[in-house]
Regions:
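N-terminal export/assembly segments and adjacent metallocofactor-ligating motifs
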Residues: 1-291, 295-338, 376, 509, ...
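N-terminal leader/propeptide and maturation segments of large enzyme subunits in energy/redox metabolism
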Residues: 113-133, 287-381, 578-704, 741, ...
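Glycine-rich phosphate/diphosphate-binding loops that line cofactor/substrate pockets in enzymes
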Residues: 135-153, 205-214, 360, 383-410, ...
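Extended redox/cofactor-interaction regions of prokaryotic respiratory oxidoreductases
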Residues: 167-247, 273, 334-341, 353, ...
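Flexible glycine/proline-rich, aromatic-decorated loop/lid segments
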Residues: 255, 543-577
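Short beta-alpha connecting loops at secondary-structure transitions
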Residues: 260-266, 559, 573-584
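Active-site phosphate/pyrophosphate-binding segments
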Residues: 353-355, 366-484
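Long, contiguous, secondary-structure-rich segments that constitute the structural scaffold
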Residues: 580-581, 590-643, 648, 752, ...
Length: 866
């Protein structure tokens, strides 16, 4: 049966009326049951079940307990038992999660496109397919590609990373033979991760709020949307009662800034200069932890005039200036490294890495930072002095019989410092400030998630050319893109030869990813989707699905099995599952069973099973070859290997938790990996960046890569943050655009495309949740004669878009703020879902050249009445 756009909307309209008329779970669920059976469901005896599981709507993975009455999910509450290990509550998005499952607009059958033209106004002319026909069609296409060149397949996922587990996607693409699996981290926190990796060879940080007395928060808005929000919000409140002071530095008065002791409205993109000025205040006053810098970091290592660290005869071991012997030596037993100064060795002059930092911030005074960042010099000085004072440099504390470094002041960020053209350098500046007071892995400081877990991050990048991957990760174009690059595949497929890709991609599979609307300059992304055969696995007819050739319906997190990801805290960790509790539309498959079936039809089932064991790092209980697995059986296998617990524990409790002892929390990270002689060192000075720059320069010149701007790249690849990193491309070039355009996340739709139709979030919570607005400072609005509720136009060098003005005090006068997640246009959404401004459409595209992270907060704009 052929389904036109009108027929598609009519098909969901019968059930859509239920959603439009009220918010009863009963009404929607019974309508869904009626749709499944073809008639109204008969009354049954009342059966009430309590089901413990995990939320998968955002990357907090909160523990939940659902009440299921006669197969209908009636309520979702936080699992009280999980409070000791992570979340004490859940957000409205999680509490209303059943409305995503009972959404009448959901995809229910496989669909095939019959209109070859693709575009927002093109009717795909969908035709329903059986699962057999869908599998046969997709498998035939995949087999042809696998036989010819497996690299021609691209797999992309977004929130799908958490719905079935990225490990399954890794295993399947590895078995298939394509290097092109790409996830969404460059739309989230990649720059922060890479800054961590360059500095301490791992990623994942949290402030030790249980003991902290001062939190300097540069744009981590965990009262609205953040990865660890459901622990950070609760722990912050507990610690405030015990004396914690919070200072939030960001251009917009966010939820977390509104509840802080102080809000510092820094000019967008200029916080790196503010941080460097604070570092200068600490250095000039001598309020730094010199023993920490010497013993744990590479601050004493000798650096030549070209920025390269002096090495021993082996070409690998860094040298320091030994104050005992008066010569350049490796930091071994008996050597006492100099922290500061310039020294002569082998007829050349070298400075310590710390001295390079000192010289680099010499002119970045608080007064200079005031001019750039528009934060008073007195405020910058006071914050630096307070940070040093509260860090209590040199103090120790005894906990559980262990004498530990005590540094109860911490600087933290999420997207605030990282979602920019120089995002890696932004957070590197924050890490340096933390290192100066010695709070890394200290009580009350910044707790690292596995210091030196990946020593390869300290190496010079591979700088691949020609690139192996379509996203260009770890190639000469993005040498330290360790977390894939979400946005580049759809650019690359438009002109593979331009970047030297030695093959032409033909097919893309998208799983739970609405990539094109999620990143800057969205319409360029959609152009890429016209170049490939696209298969989309999702729960809704997203904009990406609108450009698909085959659409396969997926199950929601309340309908499917998963060995679920979880969030740890500085004190706890836990393992969990997610289990099904309803299936109102009687759907046959989730993404795992789709992958399993395709692997069978491609003759690679056993390879898939073998790769699953590798991807999940299973050691004792393995996925066996020569047999099939249901989603539940796979989860049982992983649970048994990871927890050594009977599966009945998973079914009854949903998780098993563990609490970290004092030694594992404070003494197994930097103390074990970096402290003292004969150890690797944290990189205050990221020398691998300058070494990588010289390698890129060589490759670019040998291959005549004119698209690589070496001057721009040298700024990006500085071993230390500099003032240049406060001036991204739009700030330097868009002189005729007076306003800074910044973006932010809101809880209601953050990182979860399938909540776009949630009737509770769209209608029941009020107008503030129903759409987004263009936030304008009251003074600016007066000057422009703009009032709240009026339609305004935002104009950038990319294009124009309209939105509804909201006049506020809580944003800088030179700044316009618009949230993501709104303004979507797919005909597969309810009318209530298609409201607001899709700000990504007009954001400039200037990704971080180190990590590939998208620059969501660098665009300049004009603003006027529509």
């Amino acid at each position: 049966m052929e389904l036109s756009r009108r027929r598609f909307l009519q098909g969901v309209g019968a059930l859509g009326g239920v959603a439009a008329s009220g918010f009863s779970v009963d009404a929607i669920a019974q309508a869904a049951a009626g749709a499944k059976k073809g008639k109204a469901g008969a009354k049954a005896a009342i059966e009430i079940r309590k089901v413990k599981s995990g939320c998968a709507i955002c990357p907090n993975f909160c523990g939940i307990e659902a009440t299921v009455v006669n197969g209908i999910v009636r309520t979702i509450y936080p699992d009280a038992a999980r409070a000791d290990f992570y979340n004490h509550g859940i957000c409205p998005k999680g509490a209303s999660g059943m409305f995503n499952t009972y959404d009448p607009y959901r995809l229910k059958k496989p669909l095939r496109r019959t209109n070859p033209k693709k575009g927002p106004n093109e009717d795909p002319r969908w035709v329903e397919m059986s699962w057999e026909e869908a599998f046969s069609t997709v498998a035939a296409k995949l087999k042809k590609i696998k036989d010819e060149d497996p690299r021609k397949l691209i797999w992309q996922h977004g929130q799908g990373k958490y719905l079935i587990g990225e490990e399954f996607a890794k295993a399947w693409t590895q078995a298939f033979g394509t290097p092109n699996m790409t996830h969404r981290t460059t739309a989230c926190e990649a720059a922060r991760h890479v800054a961590d990796e360059l500095t301490w060879a791992g990623h994942g940080i949290l402030p030790d709020l249980k003991y902290s007395k001062l939190l300097l928060n540069f744009g981590a808005n965990y009262y609205e949307a953040e990865q660890a929000a459901r622990w950070l919000d609760w722990q912050t409140m507990q610690s405030i009662d015990k004396g914690l002071k919070t200072v939030v530095v960001e251009p917009r008065l966010s939820g977390v800034a509104a509840k802080a002791d102080e809000w510092v409205p820094v000019r967008p993109g200029k916080d790196v200069v503010m941080l460097l000025a604070m570092a200068k205040v600490l250095i000039d006053a001598g309020t730094i932890d010199e023993p920490f810098l010497v013993e744990y970091t590479n601050a004493p290592q000798l650096v030549d005039a070209a920025g390269v660290v002096l090495k021993d005869k082996d070409g690998k071991t860094p040298l320091v200036w030994d104050t005992v012997s008066g010569g350049a030596k490796p930091y071994t037993q008996g050597v006492k490294p100099a922290l500061k100064g310039s020294y002569n060795a082998d007829g050349k002059t070298y400075r310590t890495a710390f001295q390079v930092l000192v010289d680099g911030v010499k002119e970045i005074t608080p007064q200079y930072a005031e001019e750039v960042a528009d934060v008073p010099a007195t405020t910058i000085t006071r914050l630096a002095q307070t940070f040093a004072k509260e860090a209590r440099i040199g103090e120790t504390i005894e906990i559980d019989g262990q004498t530990l470094r005590y540094r109860p002041a911490v600087l933290y960020t999420f997207r605030g410092l990282s979602a920019k053209e120089h995002g890696v350098q932004g957070w590197r500046a924050g890490l340096i400030l933390n290192m100066l007071v010695g709070n890394i892995d200290a009580v009350g400081g910044l707790i690292l998630g596995g210091a030196y877990g990946h020593p390869e991050y300290f190496d010079v990048s591979k700088c691949e050319y020609p690139p192996k991957r379509v996203d260009l990760a770890q190639s000469v174009f993005f040498p330290y893109a360790n977390h894939h690059i979400a946005q580049t595949p759809n650019f690359t497929v438009q002109d593979p030869k331009a970047v030297g890709l030695p093959y032409v991609p033909e097919m893309q599979i998208y799983y739970a990813s609405n990539r094109a609307v999620s990143i800057p300059n969205s319409w360029r992304q959609f152009e890429g989707l016209t170049k490939t055969f696209n298969v989309v696995i999702d729960v809704l007819m997203t904009e990406t699905a609108w450009y698909a050739d085959i659409v396969l319906p997926d199950k929601t997190y309340l309908e499917s099995w998963h060995y679920a990801p979880t969030r740890s805290t500085p004190d706890t960790g836990h393992n969990a599952i997610r289990q099904p509790m309803t299936n109102p539309y009687n759907l046959e498959h989730d993404a795992f069973s789709i992958l399993w079936e395709l692997s069978k039809r491609l003759g690679m089932r056993d390879q898939f099973a073998t790769e699953i064991n590798k991807a999940w790092k299973l050691k004792e209980v393995l996925v066996k070859t020569g047999r099939d697995y249901t989603p539940r059986e796979i989860v049982e296998t992983i649970w048994a290997d990871k927890t050594k617990k009977d599966f009945s524990v998973a079914l009854d409790q949903g998780f098993v938790g563990r609490k970290k002892d004092t030694k594992s929390k404070y003494l197994s990270g930097v103390e074990k990996s970096f402290k003292g002689p004969d150890k690797a060192k944290m990189k205050l000075y990221a020398d691998q960046l300058i070494d990588t720059f010289y390698k890129v320069e060589d490759v670019a010149k040998k291959n005549s890569l004119a698209s690589i701007d070496l001057a721009k790249l040298k700024i990006a690849y500085s071993p230390l943050p500099t003032r240049d990193h406060a001036f991204p491309t739009p700030h330097r070039e868009a002189k005729d655009y007076p306003f800074y355009l910044i973006t932010h996340k809101r809880m209601y739709r953050n990182q979860s495309g399938f909540t776009v139709n949630n009737v509770i979030l769209n209608q029941a919570l009020g107008k503030d949740a129903a759409t987004n607005t263009v936030q304008i400072n009251a003074r600016t609005a007066t000057e422009l004669k703009i009032k709240s509720g009026e339609t305004v136009t935002i104009e950038t060098r990319v294009g124009k878009i309209n939105g509804t003005a909201q006049v506020v005090q809580g944003v800088r006068p030179d700044t316009i703020a618009v949230s993501y997640h709104y303004g979507q246009w797919s005909a597969g959404y309810s009318p209530e879902s298609r409201k607001g401004t899709a700000i990504n459409q007009v954001l400039e595209y200037h990704p971080d050249l180190i990590s590939g992270h998208n620059s969501f907060n660098d665009t300049k704009c004009k603003l006027y009445k529509a």
